[in-house]
Amino acid sequence: MIKDIIKLSIPRKPDYISLVRLTASGIAHSMALNIDDIEDIKVSIGEACINVLSLNNTEEISLIFEIDEDKLCIKVKDVKENIPKELDQSKERELGILIIKSLMDEVEFNEEGIIMIKYVEDDSQ
């Protein structure tokens, strides 16, 4: 069961990616995630936002943070995994997707965008 949902929309400008990273960091910290996981989340969400910036013409980037007892689920709309070659001439987007997949516990792409999940580790074990 989802505990809290935070929705964030930012202008489609690179200047606001740091705000998204800071927001994600604050949310992750409030969930008692360790510093390594917080840094992984910050890098991943930054890469997801860069993907949106380079891809579409929407006026804003929409994010949803779903806070659960054992995980943080982050949804970023309009992130794409596979781009037609005529629209993408660089390897940077591919690298960004690989970074996200390596840092987050679960990553799923769908027609709306990307879903990234980081689980809270139980330190009592």
Per-range role (PLM):
Residues I35-E60:
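Conserved ATP-binding N-box helix of the HATPase_c
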Residues M1-I6, N51-Q125:
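Conserved beta-strand-loop-beta-strand hairpin that lines the nucleotide-binding pocket
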Residues M1-V43:
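Bergerat-fold GHKL ATPase/HATPase_c domain
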Residues A28, G46-C49, K80:
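Residue-level detector of secondary-structure transition/capping positions
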